[in-house]
């Protein structure tokens, strides 16, 4: 999308032109660096511990082989699982995955994967705005985020993978948060009282993260085994 819009605006000068495109002031070369090379490098570095395993270390120079291996692992899960979920449950943030809940190092600890209850729903409102803005106001950046989110979600009900989990929502939710970020930026540019929704949304989002942080970070929990009930707002999260 970035390349197409730059080419449309500047033709042969698209590589170093700063005008046009979904993000004004950024050249195509800069976009390739910050949106391409840097994320790929950080992704590669996230495997650093695996490069140094004593047994079966990951080959650092075969990243495509990592993806192939992970796909095989994903496709190998075919039996029902207590934490499996469906795509529409991800949208509603109705299901969670527990990775840990037991006593570790003398304290009760837990690690649960769940979406931020506030931002997940705020993102859906922003998705509707992004679609409207993309069509009505030619906000191609917002429209691109919205269409990409929808495209990533549509493939799951059509997928042949029988067992699905909420972590499959990580990529679509990234574009959902992109819609939210652009929506908040649009609110902040207003000159009326609605602009103050932007800091309010940010404050609530951060507050919600802080509230759930102990149960997603393996922090020591007070209250023993029943401690997790403090964060279980929905029965389906248990």
Mark where each language-model region is.
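Membrane-interfacial loop-to-transmembrane alpha-helix junctions, especially the N-terminal start
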Residues: 120, 136-148, 193-201
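Membrane-interface helix-loop-helix junctions at transmembrane boundaries of multi-pass membrane enzymes
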Residues: 11-30, 126-147
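Membrane-interface catalytic loops of GT-C/OST-like multi-pass glycosylation enzymes that act
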Residues: 112-115, 157-170, 215-219
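Hydrophobic transmembrane alpha-helices of multi-pass, membrane-embedded glycosylation machinery
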Residues: 1-8, 171-174
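Luminal/periplasmic active-site loops of membrane-embedded glycosylation enzymes
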Residues: 56-104, 229-238
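Hydrophobic/aromatic-rich transmembrane helices and adjacent perimembrane loops
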Residues: 163-185
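Hydrophobic, aromatic-rich transmembrane alpha-helices
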Residues: 103-139
């Amino acid at each position: 999308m970035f390349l197409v819009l730059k080419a449309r605006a500047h033709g042969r000068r698209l590589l170093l032109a700063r005008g046009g495109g979904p993000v004004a002031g950024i050249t195509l070369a800069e976009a390739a660096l910050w949106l391409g090379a840097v994320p790929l490098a950080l992704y590669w570095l996230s495997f650093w511990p695996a490069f140094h395993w004593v047994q079966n270390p990951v080959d650092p120079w075969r990243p495509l082989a990592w993806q192939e291996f992970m796909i095989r692992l994903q496709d190998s899960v075919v039996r029902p699982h207590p934490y499996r979920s469906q795509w529409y449950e991800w949208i509603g943030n109705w299901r969670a995955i527990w990775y840990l809940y037991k006593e570790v190092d003398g304290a009760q600890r837990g690690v649960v994967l769940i979406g931020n209850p506030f931002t997940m729903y705020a993102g859906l409102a922003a998705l509707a705005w992004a679609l409207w803005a993309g069509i009505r106001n030619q906000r191609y950046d917002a429209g691109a985020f919205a269409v990409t989110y929808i495209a990533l979600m549509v493939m799951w009900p059509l997928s042949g993978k029988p067992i699905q989990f909420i972590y499959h929502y990580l990529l679509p939710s990234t574009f959902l948060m992109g819609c939210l970020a652009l929506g908040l930026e649009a609110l902040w540019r207003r000159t009326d009282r609605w602009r103050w929704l932007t800091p309010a949304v940010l404050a609530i989002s951060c507050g919600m993260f802080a509230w759930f942080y102990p149960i997603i970070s393996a922090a020591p929990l007070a209250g023993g085994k029943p401690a997790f009930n403090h964060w279980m707002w929905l029965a389906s999260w248990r």
